Curated annotation (Swiss-Prot):
It comes from Prochlorococcus marinus (strain MIT 9313). Its main location: membrane. Belongs to the ATPase A chain family. This is ATP synthase subunit a. The keyword NADP does not apply. Keywords: ATP synthesis, CF(0), Hydrogen ion transport, Ion transport, Membrane, Thylakoid, Transmembrane, Transmembrane helix, Transport. InterPro entries: ATP_syn_F0_a_bact/chloroplast (IPR045082), ATP_synth_F0_asu (IPR000568), ATP_synth_F0_asu_AS (IPR023011), F0_ATP_A_sf (IPR035908). The keyword Transmembrane helix applies. PROSITE patterns: ATPASE_A. The lineage of its organism: Bacteria, Bacillati, Cyanobacteriota, Cyanophyceae, Synechococcales.
Length: 241
């Protein structure tokens, strides 16, 4: 991917530039690791604050956490089914929270004020490596869900309703993580690019409505990713007759 500089300090955006950490023979994207750990720290802090002093009549952060718990529980129950959803609620909830906080952090936190030797900080989900890793994690999870619940009977899925479907089902196993990863990556990166370009062209008020639209889109993308992950797991544990 090429190099795209936008000269204004508060609107600077560099696509394809990374801060690399060398660990053995591996090159890691340092800025993605930094922002990912910041996101994880923010989620952990939210949980600690919300559960430190539990009350029967919740308010504040505890009320927010209970709302999220109920919402994720309903989502998992609807997509996975009554029998198996409890086992997968923590996974679906963690996915949703990580993506949601990452997306909103990319829109609300002024990462570009923090200067790096190379590249710049931004939403972890605006990096293709993060979204591919999340999508592969979902793929491994629904394979595990199917095999752990059905054993070798899981592979009946590939011949249901007819063996003619085998090549299509195999192709589907590759397209699921691709669609998950590129949908999330494309939307979040496009949102950051649009806001940066508008700030460069009209730096005062025009970008504000676009930023609010970006927040809405970011929340929807987190919901779509979590819903599809739950749906794929539900599809894997579903009994075929």
């Amino acid at each position: 991917m090429g190099f795209l500089p936008i000269a204004l300090p508060f609107a600077e955006l560099e696509v394809g530039q990374h801060l690399y950490w060398q660990i053995g023979n591996l090159q890691l994207h340092g800025q993605v690791f930094m922002t990912s750990w910041i996101v994880i720290g923010a989620i952990l802090a939210l949980v600690v604050v919300g559960t430190r002093k539990m009350e029967r009549d919740p308010h504040g952060v505890q009320n927010l956490l209970e709302f999220l718990w109920d919402y994720i529980r309903d989502l998992a129950r609807t997509q996975i089914g009554e029998k198996a959803y409890r086992d997968w609620m923590p996974f679906i909830g963690t996915l949703f929270l990580f993506i949601f906080v990452s997306n909103w952090g990319g829109s609300l936190v002024p990462w570009k004020l923090i200067h790096l030797p190379s590249g710049e900080l931004g939403a972890p989900t605006a990096d293709i490596n993060t979204t591919v890793a999340l999508a592969l994690l979902v793929s491994l999870s629904y394979f595990y869900a199917g095999l752990s619940r059905k054993g070798l009977r899981y592979f009946e899925y590939y011949v249901h309703p007819t063996p003619i479907m085998i090549p299509f089902k195999i192709v589907e196993d590759f397209t699921k993580p691709l669609s998950l990863s590129f949908r999330l990556f494309g939307n979040i990166l496009a949102d950051e690019l649009v806001v940066a370009v508008l700030v460069f062209l009209v730096p005062l008020f025009l970008p504000v409505p676009v930023m609010f639209l970006g927040l809405f889109t970011s929340a929807i993308q987190a919901l779509i990713f979590a819903t599809l992950a739950a749906y794929y797991i539900g599809e894997a544990v579903e009994e075929h007759h």
